[in-house]
Amino acid sequence: SFGLHRRWLRKAIGEVEAGAPAAILDVATGTADVAIALARRLPSARITGIDLSEGMLAVGRRKVAKAGLEQRIALQQADCLHLPFADESFDCITVAYGVRNFEHLLDGYREMARVLRKGGRLVVIELSTPPSALVRPFYKFYTRCVIPVAGRIVSKDVRAYSYLPESIAAVAQGEAMTALMEEAGLSDTAFRRMTFGVCTIYTGYKR
């Protein structure tokens, strides 16, 4: 992404900051990069990060310890479709580049709406397909040709790099994504396209 992902993340965290949340759930936290960024930008917040992969969480715990944030970030293995939290447990929920991997996206949104407090905000950042017919051919060439070739050079897991463009193309985008959020019980949904639409930030509230 040529470093653009850092800019996108800053914008997404700006959406989180607007609500001054005290308790944040970071879904699909992976190696905790987003959880750590949230903790640094919101010094009074406590962050819970969940992920299915214990291996990634182990890496995340080492990163959290190195950052000296063990008292503010808790990482645990959990399924986003069956969140192990009581109703209305969090002021804000974030998902960075994870919803396209949900097995059942609507069910995932319903679970997140369940554990979100009234007045709380959901912030999702996800890769997307540019809507512009002028940009789309270059984007498709990059995702379908450049990324898989680069993947073969740097990794033996070629499938992981070919899966990326497939998963981006398959996930709901724009109005279709906000419609799912609303069906799950969220309101005042909105989306903002970043960098010609290769990334989109979605927001919604629980009323």
Predicted features by range, described:
Residues 2-22, 37:
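Conserved alpha-helix/loop element of class I SAM-dependent methyltransferases that forms part
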Residues 23-82:
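Class I SAM-dependent methyltransferase SAM/SAH-binding core
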Residues 52, 104, 127:
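Short beta->alpha hinge that forms the Motif I/post-I loop of the SAM-binding pocket
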Residues 81-92:
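A short acidic, Gly/Pro-enriched loop at the edge of an enzyme's catalytic core
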Residues 91-105:
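A short SAM/SAH-binding and catalytic strip from SAM-dependent methyltransferases
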Residues 106-121:
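A short glycine-rich, Lys/Arg-flanked "PGG" loop and its adjoining helix->strand segment in the class I
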Residues 125, 129-184, 190:
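C-terminal alpha-helical "lid/dimerization" subdomain adjacent to the S-adenosyl-L-methionine
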Residues 185-207:
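Core SAM-dependent methyltransferase catalytic element
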